[in-house]
Amino acid sequence: MLPVSPYNTLHTAELVSFAKAMLRADNAGIAKQLLDPVLHGLCQLTELELHPAIFRDTEATDTANGKAVSPITAAQCAEDPERSRVFMQGLYQAITDKVSRNNTAENGRPVQLLYAGTGPFGWLLLPLLPLFSPAQLQVTLLDIHPQSMHRLTMLLQHFNVADRVAMQVVADATQWQPLPEQRFDLILSETMKHMLQQEPQVAIFSHLQQFLAPDGDLIPQQIVLSAALRWAQQHHRLGELFRLSHHSAARLAAGDTQLLQAQFTLPDFEAGPVDLALDTEIVIYN
């Protein structure tokens, strides 16, 4: 059974209103109230059942670099209000900054954005597309699952934003090669779980970073993994385990795996239960 949306049919005007409200939202509670009806509307438009009664997740794809989650699992990620809020706000600011830079350049051109791992909704980007003209923004959409790309094509046409799309590609983002002259101002990918386990975020960025323009940015700009010890009422930060950024992605692509290693000196602490805490911090943009 498809979830019920308050919209008879979700149209571009509602999508724009949602995007503008999400850009103003300052907490996850507000974002949750905003996104639920829109997400349900997208499910209805694409005939995707977000929470089927029996779900075996058989459409996930195991790659050499991690698990590419199924279209349904990718769609379920949109239910996370804080993820949606901060990514949309950070991505909007990144696009706006690049548009402003291009407008002041001698040879103005659209911002070129690559979205790797779109899922069936292109959720982090789709609501923002009507806010930019085709002359300001052109996107390349990349996903490993043809079912996802088919549904996303339906949405692009329904919301009349297909003219913002330069190319749609069904391919493994860790192997895909763009046209020789293609370079991107922004490369967006959110293909990760906590501690960057299982999913191919690291492999995707280490491969795709070579296709950034000289002043281009990865979105998110940084993903920082750190470790800490917790006991009684004490919290002792051990330090940084790994930082995924444009710089480190380029080092990994060059075969430098030393940055994947870390050593810490343990502090003195009283005998008793001690927890090792592993934290993931994500910097979307600036």
Model-predicted regions and their roles:
Residues 156:
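Conserved hydrophobic residues forming the short capping helix/wall of the S-adenosyl-L-methionine
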Residues 119-135:
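Conserved SAM-binding loop of SAM-dependent methyltransferases across substrates and taxa
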Residues 106-121:
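Conserved class I S-adenosyl-L-methionine
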Residues 47-50:
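Short helix/strand-capping turn motifs
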Residues 76-88, 117-124, 144-148, 197:
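Phosphate/oxyanion-binding active-site loops and adjacent basic polyanion-contact surfaces
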Residues 2-14, 19, 26-44, 54-64, ...:
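Class I SAM-binding transferase module
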